[in-house]
């Protein structure tokens, strides 16, 4: 059913977004999220399967927007990363001050390396944002994809 809905809407939506698990389900295999060379091939295949104007994939290491004018979405990717990271660190009851603290966190070393390599490989057809370095003893892991989308949309609205 989701394929039928996607196919019916693909020509009228601006952004189609998914997380790493959904990407792997579409591709039918596990994906090494830190292998930039293989990721490039996987993301090209994924965008061929889902020919959205802009395809967004968000993972714990990096996020990417592929397609038509992807650089218009760089701030939205960052908004999604910061929002999901804030929820991960502070849970459901996070505040604007918590968000501001997380926004200042350094990026993850592994995520930055992959994001830079993907950006170089895709050139103008993609924009990437690395994930943040997150350290907490009590992570909130449920709902991070939805929280990413909320942060993405909130950043677009600003």
In which residue ranges do the predicted regions lie?
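Active-site beta-loop-alpha junctions enriched in small/polar residues
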Residues: 1, 21, 60-62
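Structural recognition of alpha->loop->beta junctions
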Residues: 3-25, 78-82, 86-96
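Conserved phosphate-binding/catalytic region of the ribokinase-like
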Residues: 29-158
């Amino acid at each position: 059913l989701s394929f039928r809905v996607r196919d019916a809407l693909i020509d009228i939506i601006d952004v189609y977004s998914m997380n790493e698990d959904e990407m792997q389900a579409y591709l039918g295999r596990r994906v090494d999220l830190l292998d930039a060379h293989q990721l490039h091939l996987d993301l090209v295949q994924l965008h061929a399967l889902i020919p959205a104007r802009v395809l967004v994939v968000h993972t714990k290491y990096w996020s990417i927007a592929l397609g038509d004018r992807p650089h218009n979405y760089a701030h939205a990717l960052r908004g999604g990363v910061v929002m999901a990271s804030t929820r991960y660190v502070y849970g459901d009851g996070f505040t604007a001050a918590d968000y501001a603290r997380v926004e200042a966190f350094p990026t993850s070393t592994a995520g930055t390396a992959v994001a830079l390599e993907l950006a170089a490989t895709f050139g103008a057809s993609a924009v990437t944002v690395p994930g943040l370095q997150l350290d907490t003893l009590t992570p909130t892991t449920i709902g991070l994809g939805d929280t990413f989308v909320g942060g993405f949309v909130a950043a677009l609205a600003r």
